[in-house]
């Protein structure tokens, strides 16, 4: 999440956790590391300064609560202050009227049309019927893109490439989808200086009378997001914001903090290219993952999406206990294929930095290869991986059409991951990190 920012902050917290003595010098060193990471992520310097000041004052003057060590207390302070930086609370999209009308706004290239497809998918999974109206008369491919991004989702699309009147398209789409639970209106990409387009946006808003106007902001623009959000806010009443492209953006932290600074609620974030890579934005969960503390609640929710609830609990236990067999690992691989990129899934585990480096680089191709290899194993081998020696490795490789080295690689990955995850068990999570994780796991 957020590329280098997540790695830098997680590394800083890991370094702090390993300190034997925590004094004023250590506190200032930690703050410098945090400052460096945030500035590199394009967070506004004034915000970084205020955050640093708050952390320093609390770390040097507050007494740790009973049973909490000084370094655990500092980690907790960093967590608290960074959550405040991003707005503290989450804002859910509440569909409380029908048809619930959502007007989508955003600059061209912000990922607006893609995000409409993702939100339509999100709403369909919640059981709502969805209609999407294309009022973008500026881009010839706008309607086709909407159809492409909503394909197979049972979402109705309305648009007319011959009609150049965006207001007429909005009126007709509104009339057509009156029986839908939710109507989403796609609009032309706007530039904050294009007065004609901003005026059209105001006119569209008057016709649609949206329950909510959602502004889509490209996370790669960093703190420029502040000015963009303010420009749109002057033209219409923005209900919420979605920040996209946070899966690898170097400036994502700057975009998130800039938007939060002006008080605009961030409801969702885009975390990848897949249709399911849209997450409800929760500052507490988000910061927990950035600091390497994991997000077991989100992980459990993802698991529950692809399995029965009872299996979800067992799967989480298997991941954390380190007792799972190759059979369990096969189930995990199958589920991870549905849950999203492995790097995102792993970031939800507390202490994910302890996992083997290759774990975060696992590709879908590698997972498919490993599944084929495991399909060539006997029931006994899946249950007792330790019995797989030279002759069995050769047989499994021949049966799966892979090399001996591939089978050995799988077994090595299994052993190392099992050992690493064993250290992440629920009983071993103490201090504020443990309290947070146990709260997430309720």
Curated annotation (Swiss-Prot):
Q: Establish whether keyword Iron-sulfur is in the entry.
A: no
Tell me the compartments it is located in.
Cytoplasm
Leading EC class: hydrolase
Keywords, in A-Z order = Cytoplasm, GTP-binding, Hydrolase, Nucleotide-binding, Ribonucleoprotein, RNA-binding, Signal recognition particle
- State its Enzyme Commission number(s): 3.6.5.4
Q: Which Gene3D superfamilies match?
A: P-loop containing nucleotide triphosphate hydrolases, Signal recognition particle SRP54, nucleotide-binding domain, Signal recognition particle, SRP54 subunit, M-domain
A GO cellular component entry from the record: signal recognition particle
Alphabetically, which GO biological process terms does the record hold? Answer: SRP-dependent cotranslational protein targeting to membrane
Assembly notes = Part of the signal recognition particle protein translocation system, which is composed of SRP and FtsY. Archaeal SRP consists of a 7S RNA molecule of 300 nucleotides and two protein subunits: SRP54 and SRP19.
Kindly provide the name given to this protein in its UniProt entry.
Signal recognition particle 54 kDa protein
Q: Give the species.
A: Methanothermobacter thermautotrophicus (strain ATCC 29096 / DSM 1053 / JCM 10044 / NBRC 100330 / Delta H) (Methanobacterium thermoautotrophicum)
Taxonomic classification, please? Answer: Archaea, Methanobacteriati, Methanobacteriota, Methanomada group, Methanobacteria
């Amino acid at each position: 999440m957020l590329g280098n920012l997540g790695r830098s902050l997680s590394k800083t917290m890991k370094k702090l956790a390993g300190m034997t003595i925590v004094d004023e010098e250590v506190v200032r060193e930690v703050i410098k590391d945090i400052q460096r990471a945030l500035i590199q992520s394009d967070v506004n310097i004034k915000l970084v300064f205020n955050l640093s000041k708050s952390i320093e004052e609390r770390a040097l003057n507050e007494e740790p609560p009973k049973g909490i060590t000084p370094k655990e207390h500092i980690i907790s302070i960093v967590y608290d202050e960074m959550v405040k930086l991003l707005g503290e609370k989450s804002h859910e999209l509440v569909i409380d009227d029908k048809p619930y009308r959502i007007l989508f706004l955003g600059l061209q290239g912000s990922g607006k049309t893609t995000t409409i497809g993702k939100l339509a998918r999100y709403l369909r999974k919640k059981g709502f019927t969805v209609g999407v109206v294309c009022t973008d008369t500026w881009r010839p491919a706008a309607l086709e893109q909407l159809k492409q991004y909503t394909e197979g989702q049972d979402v109705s699309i309305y648009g007319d490439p011959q009609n150049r009147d965006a207001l007429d398209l909005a009126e007709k789409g509104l009339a057509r989808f009156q029986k839908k639970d939710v109507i989403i209106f796609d609009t032309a990409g706007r530039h904050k200086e294009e007065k004609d387009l901003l005026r059209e946006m105001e006119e569209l808003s008057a016709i649609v009378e949206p329950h909510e106007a959602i502004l889509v902001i490209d996370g790669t623009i960093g703190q420029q997001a502040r000015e963009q959000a303010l420009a749109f806010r002057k033209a219409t009443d923005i209900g919420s914001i979605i920040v996209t492209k946070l899966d690898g953006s170097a400036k994502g932290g700057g975009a998130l903090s800039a938007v939060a600074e002006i008080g605009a609620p961030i409801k969702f974030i885009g975390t990848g290219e897949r249709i399911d890579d849209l997450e409800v934005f929760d500052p507490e969960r988000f910061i927990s993952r950035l600091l390497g503390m994991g997000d077991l609640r989100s992980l459990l929710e993802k698991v529950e999406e692809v399995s029965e609830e009872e299996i979800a609990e067992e799967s989480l236990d298997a991941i954390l206990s380190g007792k799972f067999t190759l059979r369990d690992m096969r189930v995990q691989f199958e589920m991870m294929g549905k849950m999203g990129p492995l790097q995102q899934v792993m970031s939800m585990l507390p202490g994910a930095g302890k996992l083997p480096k290759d774990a975060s680089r696992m590709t879908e191709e590698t997972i498919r290869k490993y599944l084929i290899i495991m399909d060539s194993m006997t029931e006994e081998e899946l249950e007792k991986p330790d019995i797989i020696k030279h002759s069995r490795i050769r047989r499994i490789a021949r049966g799966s059409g892979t090399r001996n080295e591939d089978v050995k690689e799988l077994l090595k990955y299994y052993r190392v991951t099992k050992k690493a995850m064993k250290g992440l068990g629920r009983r071993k999570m103490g201090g504020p990190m443990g309290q947070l994780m146990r709260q997430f796991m309720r």
